[in-house]
């Protein structure tokens, strides 16, 4: 596998492809507006991204229109040093880890989804509260996997509640958080290449508690008029 060097891989690409994968599991197609992605599908209503059941996909439209308007494009323009393309094995390993996490905590995720009560006005607060709690005691690969899976849950719930434009924002928040708060830790710990080497298909199980070193509790607490969602991780 190609080495990313000190600058690392493009976090935006990792986020976008992960969200696309999670939505596709539920039968939704997400048009990212990425110039390097597959051709875009026509949206049923004006917008940056479109969500359609796979059985109702419409013919492709020119990708440049959505690419110019995507709120994520400034992250690329201001990314600084050139980032390395993300090897497919990184996406595959992260997806497998996320799926394993989701299976282990299926009941918790189902409860969380039903109680998120996302709206365009509350989504940012929900995201910030969970992520702050998730990494309060430090960073490890298990918490990074949980971070991606939580973002996927928020995106799926947004689409289920007919608020698909929120996915634009969630993808942006995830990318910004990775760039500002997690990128240094990832690079200091061998980068995504190390994640693949440690937890890839030929190595130990992707979600073995021996490497995750945590027990996850996803809980919701009502405080006044606001719901505070916490992802509490405790060491074994």
Swiss-Prot record:
Motif (BH1): 133-152
Keywords linked to the UniProt accession: Apoptosis, Autophagy, Cytoplasm, Endoplasmic reticulum, Membrane, Mitochondrion, Mitochondrion outer membrane, Nucleus, Phosphoprotein, Transmembrane, Transmembrane helix, Ubl conjugation
Main location: mitochondrion
Residue(s) at site: Cleavage: 34-35
Induction section of the entry: Down-regulated by lipopolysaccharides.
Protein name: Apoptosis regulator Bcl-2
GO MF assignments: BH domain binding; BH3 domain binding; channel activity; channel inhibitor activity; DNA-binding transcription factor binding; identical protein binding; molecular adaptor activity; protease binding
